[in-house]
């Protein structure tokens, strides 16, 4: 949110929205929420209602901004209109929802589920980078610039078999940090 240029109040509120974005899952039956297999189409239709349920839970909370409430309601909307619950597109999707969406997708990809193994952080970033029709590109870039896949000082194996040490992360090339070859001494 900071990378996107939001002010202190907005950063605070997007944090609240992020914490509350799945509150509507409290209204989804446990047998669906905790199912150890992939959901059926009927079960998924019920699960997709969690964002509406969350909005309804928060609707009467006068101390929460409309941006927080819309972030909860719209966090599964996609820029191309193929999201839910309303199928809205582009700038019709609240900024908070667009911000939450990228983080929510990353979390879903790297988290183990009973029906799937987690993806590596690198694979998750690659998948997110391919979602240019679904996600707000500016929000995606801000998220990717904030993700540190390879902490400085970490040793990694390069594709040529050499071992190298991460010396710098490159903001616009999150998958290609600067490295120092440990045997060659070259950056």
Where are these regions (language model features)?
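Histidine- and acidic-residue-rich, metal-dependent catalytic cores
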Residues: 1-187
